[in-house]
A protein has these predicted regions:
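Secretory targeting and sorting signals
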Residues: 1-21
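Carbohydrate-active catalytic/glycan-binding domains of CAZyme proteins
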Residues: 22-289, 324, 369-373, 378-384, ...
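Short, exposed beta-strand-loop hairpins at the edges of beta-sheets
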Residues: 269-270, 405-411
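Short amphipathic alpha-helical linker/capping segments at the junctions of internal repeats
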Residues: 317-322, 363-374, 410-423
C-alpha cells in the first residue's frame, strides 16, 4: 500500500502546458430551409464536421438574409454581406467581433439603372489587399443574371464603387465565387440554363474569363448552385454547393488545382438544413487534434458514442475518437479540456463520475467538470493521466470500457488511467 501511495504522489508532477499548436478554424454562415430571415453560424476544425455556434445568430431589421458571405477584415472584425430580398437593388451588411453577436450596419443601394434583382453577394479579397464583392444582377426587361464586381472605397466598408460586369461570364450566370492563385483568377459559377456549376479563369478580376469546365465537367450533376471554396491544410481545395432540387448539401475535393474532383458527398449533419453558405478558414486556436490510446488495451481509443465516452478498437467513424486538446476551460495553466472534432462546442465532462460528451453551457460548473490536469502516467510516466480539476483525487479511467473518474488505488486502476496522445 505504501508503494502505491508513493506512486500516486509521484504522478502529481504536472506535465508541460498543453500544446500551443494552432488548429485551423472554419466558420460557416448560412441561411436554412426553415428560414430565409435568420442567419446561422457554425464552426469546424476539419472543414467537414460543423457544430452550431449560434442559431439564429442574426436577424436583419427588415427583409431577408439569404446567401450570407463572411469575411474577416484587417480591423479584426467579421463582416457578412447578404441578399436582402428576392427583388430590389440592395445588399445588406452586418458586423461582429466574436462571430456570435451581430449588428446590422446598412443596406447599400447599387447604382445600376432599372436594377430588379440583386442576389448572392460574395466577398473577394484580392492579393493587393482590396476588398471586393462579386454579385449577380438582373435588370428590368432582361431574363438573365450577369455577374458583377463592386469594390470597397473605404476601410470601413461603407462606400462602394458602381458595379462592373465580369467579362466572359454573362449573361446567364449566377452565384459566382472567385479564388486567386498566383496571377490567375478562378471563377466557379452556376449556368442558369443548364443548372451546372461551371469553371472559368482570367488574368484580371473583371475578365475576360475563359471557360475551362462546362456542363457536367466535374461530375457533380446539375440542379446545383451556391459554390463556395476553401483550401484545406493538405493543400487540396474543397467546394461546397447546394443541391437545391434534392434538398441536400454537398462537398467535393480537388488535389490537382481544379483539374479533377472527388465524388460529391453530403455535408455531415447539415445536409438538408443549411442553404447557400460560405466558409471562412482562419489559422486558428491553441490546441492539437489527438486520439487517446489506452495503455493496457493499446488497440482501443477513447471515443464518444451516443454522447457517452468509452474506449473501443476500430472506431467507426474514426472522427468520434478525435479530440482537440485545448487549455482547460476552468484553468488554462497546466490543465486541459477535450473538445470533440466532429461535434465542435461539445466537451468531455464528468457527470455523476461518468464521462459524457456535452455542449458547453457556459456555466462555471461545466467548465470545472470539463477540466483535467494532465500529469505523468500512473502506470508509465512516459504516458499521460488526467486528474479531475474539481475532484482532485480522481482520474479519468476506463472501467468495463466505459470512461469515468475514480480514485486510483490499485495497479489495475493505474493502467486503466493511463493514455497516450497520438496523432489522428
Amino acid at each position: 500500500m505504501l508503494a502505491l501511495t508513493s506512486m500516486a504522489l509521484a504522478v502529481l508532477t504536472l506535465l508541460p502546458a498543453p500544446a500551443s499548436a494552432a488548429t485551423p478554424v472554419y466558420t460557416m454562415t448560412a441561411f436554412t430551409n426553415s428560414s430565409e430571415s435568420n442567419m446561422y453560424v457554425y464552426q469546424s476544425y476539419d472543414g467537414t464536421h460543423y457544430g452550431l455556434m449560434k442559431g439564429p445568430a442574426y436577424t436583419p431589421p427588415s427583409g431577408l438574409i439569404r446567401d450570407p458571405s463572411i469575411l474577416r477584415h484587417t480591423d479584426g472584425v467579421y463582416y457578412v454581406t447578404y441578399t436582402t430580398n428576392w427583388d430590389g437593388n440592395t445588399i445588406g451588411f452586418a458586423r461582429s467581433t466574436d462571430r456570435v453577436n451581430w449588428t446590422f450596419m446598412q443596406n447599400v443601394t447599387l447604382p445600376t439603372a432599372n436594377l430588379q434583382n440583386t442576389w448572392a453577394p460574395e466577398w473577394f479579397k484580392d492579393s493587393d489587399g482590396s476588398i471586393n464583392i462579386i454579385v449577380s444582377l438582373r435588370t428590368t426587361g432582361t431574363s438573365n443574371f450577369t455577374p458583377h464586381v463592386i469594390k470597397a472605397l473605404n476601410a470601413s466598408l461603407t462606400a462602394w464603387s458602381s458595379p462592373v460586369p465580369l467579362s466572359g461570364l454573362g449573361p446567364n450566370y449566377i452565384d459566382t465565387f472567385i479564388v486567386k492563385l498566383g496571377s490567375t483568377y478562378h471563377a466557379f459559377t452556376k449556368n442558369e440554363t443548364s443548372k451546372y456549376i461551371e469553371y472559368a479563369t482570367a488574368s484580371s478580376l473583371t475578365g475576360p474569363y475563359t471557360f475551362k469546365g462546362t456542363g457536367d465537367w466535374a461530375g457533380w450533376g446539375n440542379w446545383v448552385e451556391g459554390p463556395a471554396l476553401i483550401q484545406l491544410d493538405n493543400g487540396s481545395w474543397r467546394i461546397l454547393f447546394d443541391g437545391y432540387s434534392s434538398g441536400k448539401y454537398y462537398y467535393s475535393d480537388s488535389a490537382n488545382t481544379f483539374a479533377s474532383w472527388s465524388a460529391k458527398k453530403e455535408l455531415p449533419s447539415l445536409t438538408g438544413f443549411v442553404r447557400h453558405l460560405t466558409v471562412l478558414k482562419e489559422p486558428g486556436q491553441a490546441g492539437d487534434i489527438r486520439r487517446l490510446q489506452s495503455f493496457n488495451f493499446p488497440d482501443r481509443y477513447a471515443r464518444h458514442y451516443d454522447y457517452q465516452a468509452r474506449i473501443e478498437p476500430n472506431v467507426s467513424p474514426v472522427e468520434d475518437s478525435r479530440f482537440r486538446i485545448v487549455p482547460g476551460l476552468a484553468d488554462g495553466n497546466g490543465a486541459v479540456s477535450f473538445e470533440s472534432v466532429n461535434l465542435p462546442g461539445y466537451f468531455l465532462r464528468h457527470s455523476n463520475y461518468v464521462l459524457v460528451l456535452a455542449r458547453d453551457d457556459g456555466t462555471n460548473q461545466f467548465k470545472q467538470d470539463a477540466t483535467f490536469r494532465d500529469v505523468a502516467g500512473t502506470a508509465n510516466p512516459a504516458w499521460t493521466s488526467y486528474q479531475s480539476y474539481n475532484v482532485p483525487g480522481s482520474y479519468i479511467r476506463h472501467y468495463n470500457y466505459t470512461l469515468r473518474i475514480d480514485p486510483i488505488n490499485s495497479s489495475t486502476g493505474q493502467s486503466d488511467a493511463t493514455f497516450k496522445e497520438v496523432s489522428p
